[in-house]
A protein has these predicted regions:
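A short Gly-Trp-Pro
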Residues: 1-8, 13-128
Length: 128
């Protein structure tokens, strides 16, 4: 069942809300940027995401094939969400007031994007 979550960057300049069902799953990836930032994400349909404030505080980082836009707050540096190529995902650690038990119970799928393999998880995931 979807729940509407409020979310923000660390300084609060960027605020959003997203209708998510964390019980349907979250994901972690071992690509270079997700690994370096320890990203833990939840997919969200574009129609279920609303940027409430802070568009002017957002900057964009792209790399490699330049498909995804890794949006980050220019004031505090936090990346609350990524979007592009028909995808949108929010960082679960940017959800304000989320019950820790919901995060504990949320299934996590692992993607081996370091080797461009979306079908098989990495051999080791404890460090992600």
């Amino acid at each position: 069942m979807k729940t509407t979550y409020q979310g923000s960057c660390h300084c609060g300049a960027v605020r959003f809300e997203a209708d998510l069902d964390l019980a349907k799953g979250t994901f972690k990836c071992n690509c270079s940027i997700c690994f370096k930032t320890r990203a833990w994400l939840a997919p969200v349909a574009a129609s279920d995401f609303r940027l409430l404030s802070g568009e002017e505080s957002l900057a964009d980082y792209q790399f490699n094939r330049r498909v995804l836009h890794h949006r980050f707050c220019t004031k505090c540096g936090v990346r609350p969400f990524s979007q592009g190529d028909g995808q949108l995902a929010v960082r679960v650690n940017c959800l304000d007031g989320v019950d820790p038990q919901e995060l504990i119970d949320a299934p996590v799928k692992y993607f081996n994007m370091r080797h461009d393999d979306v079908k098989s998880p990495p051999a080791e995931t404890r460090h992600l």
